[in-house]
């Protein structure tokens, strides 16, 4: 019996050592399976349930407007919301919520919402966020990368989810890797590598992780640790120049041409719940 116990323990130990176990850093952050063993290190850990828990900490790490117009731009194109700081970044037990609120009527300019633009910038790496998106027609949560030099394009949309009742719903996410020819007339013609992924689940039902591995010549998208996109891609401006470092953005837009107008059934306040945003680099 004693011999059998030793054999059993040795066999169990061998099985454990042979099993794929995620590496956990000293701060308790697991290395994502997609990049485990590839030499990545954690460079930013914006954990809204642990190390960023109030407005002061948030402001040290993030701006709350776009970089354009001297850092004061509060919307893009025909979006209805205006990004503000009036109860639009709300901390609770689970993390941070970017909150869209109707403050002046359900119309363009009548909605305030929240956004984050990182003060940190970097080029290449593995960018991951764990979020729960809101349900409702006309809502447009997004997690993306944009150059710090204020020249657009390119951009990398890690996740965009809309429910416009037509081509894209909450059980898909849209991705964009943008750069293209000169003298184009609109945004869509410049975004030369885009598409959607539909796993058959409603992202508004719970938290999900969205990530991109961005290298000098490729982008790989991951949803809940599953790779869904793998494409050749070069980060450059329309004139062929390298676009340099990017900042990280997370925002909850409302309305506009793609998501359409909110419907009477769209519930406000609407919340994009953010557990964490992390960046890994080599």
Regions found by a protein language model. Give the residues of each.
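N-terminal secretory signal peptides that target proteins for export/translocation
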Residues: 1-6
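Extracytoplasmic entry segments of secretory-pathway proteins
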Residues: 7, 24-26
